[in-house]
């Protein structure tokens, strides 16, 4: 049996984020170890293949195509939380800065906000949004510290 991919679902007009959630995280695997915060509106998780250590995503629980579709209350909640998370990531991981990015611009999107740390040894600028992805390396102490700050 061939494994279904995010691209396969997108090509079929199916939101991969919603499909993944509805089918027991079959695409990304169990995210429990990477989940930093969750409520009825959104979930905040460390990325499985990060562009930098501490790369995090905030994903709306309900399906919205992009920021233009989300209710004002959700927008407020996500961005207030994002500010808190950015400061926490900077503190816990020692990042010089944390970029906030939302680029929902494909045939099948699900609103999300990415928080991508930039470290002092890295160049500034938008190229950080497309840095090569790396394998996720769990750091239980840092995850615990982030959870403590964010919850």
Language-model regions, residue ranges each:
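HIT superfamily nucleotide-processing domains
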Residues: 1-151
């Amino acid at each position: 049996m061939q494994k279904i991919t995010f691209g396969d679902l997108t090509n079929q007009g199916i939101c991969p984020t919603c499909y993944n959630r509805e089918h027991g995280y079959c695409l990304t695997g169990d995210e429990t170890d990477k989940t930093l915060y969750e409520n009825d509106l959104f979930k905040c998780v460390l990325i499985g293949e990060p562009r930098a250590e501490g790369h995090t995503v905030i994903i709306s629980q309900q399906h919205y195509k992009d920021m233009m579709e989300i209710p004002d209350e959700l927008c407020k909640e996500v961005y207030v939380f994002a500010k808190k998370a950015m400061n926490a990531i900077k503190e816990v991981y020692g990042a010089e800065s944390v970029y906030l990015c939302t680029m929902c611009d494909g045939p099948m999107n699900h609103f999300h906000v990415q928080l991508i740390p930039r470290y002092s040894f890295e160049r500034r600028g938008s190229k950080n949004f497309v840095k090569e992805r790396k394998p996720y390396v769990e750091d239980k102490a840092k995850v615990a510290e982030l959870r403590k700050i964010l919850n």
